[in-house]
Amino acid sequence: MQRVVENLLKKKEKDVRKKQLRYIKSHIFRSELRKLFIMNFGALKKPSISLENIKNASLSQLQKMRLEAEDVEYKSLVDLEPVILEYVKTQHVWQLFMEKAMDFHFESIVEDMIYLIHFINDVKIFKDTYPEKLFIEEVKNNELMMRKIYKVLGDGIRSFLNYAIELKEKAPEFLEEILYDYQFTQNLQKESRY
């Protein structure tokens, strides 16, 4: 009986930690990573997924988008450079997220963040050494580095879609607010170009 109670308490504690991490993720996705996700989806060629599509999608459509996002393709290599550099600019966010995942004992998230931070450091070392060169141009023939790039950027797309699915199920009005904020930012960026 005691073991059953302990297991129930552990499950409840884990659920509380998941909820706390979801709040942290909400803040991060809505504020500090907004530009990154807008850029990443903007550079995406296949699957053809836009923030507008996500906003108007049903749960089953979001799940279909997520499946299609297992294999991503980008418009061009040059379109990847600003997305990669935005990852570098947001390193502090990934570091914070890794620390919170450690605090909450979410090992898979910690592993993902370590991989991402290592990638960011690869880019930073390159840019410190060759500030005038495009990172993507220099590594386009390096198979290992290109795999890292597609993994990091693709994982970003998939993470956003996973989060959209989670919110669609648990807090659809919050998903709508986040996507409204994203579209507002996108529109401001478009207006500033003209």
Predicted features along the sequence, with ranges:
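Long, hydrophobic alpha-helical segments that serve as membrane-spanning/inserting helices
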Residues: 16-194
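Membrane-embedded hydrophobic alpha-helical segments
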Residues: 1-13
